[in-house]
Amino acid sequence: MVIIQTLLSSFFIWCIIIAFLGMLQGEKKSAGSSEKNTASNDKAENFSRFAVVICAHDEENVIGNLLENLQSQNYPAEKFHVFVLADHCKDGTVKKAKAFANVTVWQRTGGERSGKGAVLNWGMEKILQKQNGFDRVLFFDADNQIRPDFLQHMNDAFAQGAEIVTGRRLTENPFDSLISQWYTLYWAVVNSLYNRPRQNLGLSSMLSGTGFAFRMELIRDSGWKTYSLSEDIEFTFLENLKGHCVTYLNDAIFYDEQPVRLYVMWTQLRRWCTGDFQIAFRYFGQWVKAFAKKPSWRLWDIFMGVGMTVFFGLTAVSYLIHGSLLIWQGQFPLLAVSTLVSYAATIAVGFAAAAKSSWPVKKLLPGILTFPVFYSLFSYISLQSLFFPQKKWVRIEHKSSKMHF
């Protein structure tokens, strides 16, 4: 049992090692850092032309905030155009989006509403057909809000050679509930202990659904084609197989509304886990061929990153079985110690992530002290998704208020 636990835990151990080495390495300037190459972007010909893509399904409550943010960018208006992909919208999303200049709204009414991946497959094909000279594609969800310098930072990153860039996701509603606190800590872990260390080590970061961009030539011939419920992770995985690395841009900050209720959290995490399983089953053979042909730490790391979610539930089961055996053998002190160590370690991770992300630790203390509960639920959801995968995309309602920058 100990051997099985060690094998399953190897994914988490690997991530801990990378996080530790990345922090020891020290800060490597991200492409597009505010301290680099600002002078070279004074001339208009050095500005990339962005196709800004927003997926929306009944988002009239929030999409106006993002569109206002885009109009307030410190970036030439003629160098980007917004495409709103309105998927089976029955509210005022289309009307609200059309009221903004520099915005094209396409309404998808055919077929069933099957999630963002299908909408992007449809919308990106239309954008590619237009041939309007776009250099980059930038993706947002309708509930996002962005700082005025977001596009400028993205442009700087591409000017310095980046191929795929992801920004730093922060929570719009960090203190609304215990659930939103957990999400705030989770994204702090992703930013500070997953993506940033990999940036420092020259490995690939992971896309996370929104707030990312890439060079148009990556899909100009093949188009955008994803099949899983986690189109962001799928795109990351496929591009890494082709040799394209994801750059993490700490200065490109965007905000995302997080769930506040357990049911909504459960639904979202189940979709993520189902998508990761779909990716693992579909592309494992391709990964083996790519790694055998040209082994690299980058390919190994991206496999471990996806595998961590895949084996999350199995790891929890192994520890549950191990704990049951300890109880049956009467080794209660050993069980208590191992449980407390695991609990304390997870709290320490939450505390470190919050501190490194400059969140007020005192205000997040309820979330930090119960962070192990979040990961315990996450592991159960992962196991549930393995045997009972989520079949359809489920909408999450957004109600976030406007932020002021």
Put a short name on every predicted segment:
Residues 109, 113-130, 149-228, 270, ...:
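Long helical/loop segments within the catalytic core of UDP-sugar-dependent glycosyltransferases
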Residues 86-94, 110-112, 145:
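A conserved acidic beta->alpha catalytic loop
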Residues 92, 140-157:
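Acidic donor-binding/catalytic loop of UDP-sugar-dependent glycosyltransferases
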Residues 1-68:
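N-proximal low-complexity "stem/linker" segments adjacent to membrane-targeting elements
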Residues 68-79:
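Short, acidic, metal-binding catalytic loop of nucleotide-sugar glycosyltransferases
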Residues 48-51, 81, 234:
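Cell-envelope/extracellular polymer assembly enzymes that use nucleotide-activated donors
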Residues 64, 91-99, 107, 116, ...:
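Acidic helix N-cap motif at the loop->helix transition within catalytic regions
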Residues 20-48, 285-302, 325-405:
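Juxtamembrane C-terminal module of membrane proteins
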